[in-house]
């Protein structure tokens, strides 16, 4: 038994006395920022994360549809399976999660503390794939819009969705820039 707790049997049960001193964080098995789940629990959590039809995608699609825009979604015929495809405008929209696409400088992207070599490779592959997709669409003279999660997430979500929708519509109707990136504040 360490000096942190004392155990005594009282009335046939177990009584755990409060610690006489608080633990030193350097000696804790769980430090802030470390994974507290076992591999099976982590696998279950990660497998429940959706890769399409996320709430952000649905919100942007709903806002565009309400304005009369018609589109395709996650069509496998298009490289990278863009979240929204607007063939009439030769435009594709990717709605990127800040964590999964390693959005540098974003408050929603925090590099994981556990299994760092895996995550380093994963983020490098994701970024390389994103760059390949962007290059492909630019070579095919399609326009590409990247909407980052941080542009919509947080307080005043409905206002942020409206602002993002308005910016996309302006880009589609009035501008012919080949690339648009919408980031959070």
Regions found by a protein language model. Name each.
Residues 12, 16-17:
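Short hydrophobic alpha-helical segments enriched in small aliphatic residues
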């Amino acid at each position: 038994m360490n000096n942190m707790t004392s155990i005594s049997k009282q009335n046939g049960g177990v009584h755990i006395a409060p610690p006489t001193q608080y633990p030193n964080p350097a000696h804790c098995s769980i430090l802030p920022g470390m994974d507290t789940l076992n591999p099976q629990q982590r696998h279950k959590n990660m497998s429940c994360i959706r890769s399409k039809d996320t709430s952000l995608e649905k919100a942007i699609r709903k806002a565009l549809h309400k304005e009369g825009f018609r589109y395709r979604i996650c069509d496998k015929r298009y490289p990278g399976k863009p979240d929204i495809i607007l063939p009439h405008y030769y435009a594709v929209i990717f709605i990127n999660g800040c964590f999964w696409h390693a959005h540098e400088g974003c408050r929603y992207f925090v590099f994981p503390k556990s299994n760092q070599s895996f995550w380093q490779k994963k983020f490098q592959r994701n970024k390389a794939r994103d760059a390949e997709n962007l290059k492909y669409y630019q070579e095919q003279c399609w326009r590409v819009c990247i909407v980052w999660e941080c542009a919509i997430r947080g307080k005043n979500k409905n206002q942020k969705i409206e602002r993002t929708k308005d910016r996309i519509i302006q880009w589609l109707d009035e501008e012919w820039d080949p690339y648009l990136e919408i980031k959070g504040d």
